[in-house]
């Protein structure tokens, strides 16, 4: 767990030097298969013992497919989702968050000595709060200050990037579904992974992806591909 909401027993955080893109580039260097960019998948079909991936350009058949995306996106891709897939994947809700990279210090504590990696800001005691990350401290960046703010209540000055992302909401329904996700994995050759298997963090997505790859390997162990016949 990230420990953001607790004051005691804070975990020791570590970051990947030069940012999270480093592990994506490392995967790309080691991956022996083919990576197709700008090829959005429109539908996943389970037909005659294999899985068909439908894109705008062509269809391709596979022995197994891993849907490494948000649970609601995975559910929308399935041509004929099972009742269990509808129940578990559909139980996860998502919230769209605005994420702004900027250099506006007004989103930080007035005293610089109080700046930390994560900083919460509230205008009213019972009002909404914004969370700002001090990227210089997190990524050991020298020089100009850079901050990453989630859902800023006011528009920051000196914006470098302004994006919207969907984050899972871990309510009671989501946590109950999360405990049963392993029950739907592998049905008809379709496997699932994503940060929603954990707490929505990069580490959760990575761990989930490795687990899905291992489950595919175990499921296909000793089998002859139907596509080679």
Residue ranges of predicted features:
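Short, well-ordered alpha-helix to beta-strand connector turns
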Residues: 31-32, 62-63, 187
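Active-site catalytic microenvironments for nucleophilic, acid-base chemistry
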Residues: 30, 80, 215, 219
């Amino acid at each position: 767990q990230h420990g953001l909401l607790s004051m005691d027993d804070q975990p020791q955080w570590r970051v990947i030097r030069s940012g999270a893109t480093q592990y994506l580039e490392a995967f790309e260097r080691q991956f022996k298969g083919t990576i197709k960019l700008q090829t959005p998948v429109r539908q996943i079909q389970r037909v005659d013992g294999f899985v068909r991936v439908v894109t705008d350009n062509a269809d391709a058949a596979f022995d197994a497919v891993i849907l490494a995306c948000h649970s609601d996106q995975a559910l929308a891709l399935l041509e004929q989702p099972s009742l269990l897939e509808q129940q578990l994947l559909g139980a996860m809700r998502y919230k769209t968050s605005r994420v702004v990279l900027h250099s506006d210090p007004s989103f930080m504590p007035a005293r610089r000595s109080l700046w930390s990696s994560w900083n919460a800001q509230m205008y009213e005691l019972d009002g909404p709060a914004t969370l700002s990350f001090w990227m210089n401290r997190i990524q050991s960046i020298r020089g100009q200050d850079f901050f990453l703010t989630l859902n800023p209540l006011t528009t920051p000055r000196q914006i470098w990037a302004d994006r919207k992302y969907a984050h899972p909401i871990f309510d009671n329904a989501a946590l109950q579904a999360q405990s049963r996700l392993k029950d739907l994995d592998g049905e008809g050759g379709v496997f699932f992974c994503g940060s929603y298997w954990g707490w929505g963090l990069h580490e959760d997505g990575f761990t989930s992806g490795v687990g899905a790859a291992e489950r595919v390997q175990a499921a296909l162990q000793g089998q002859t591909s139907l596509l080679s016949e």
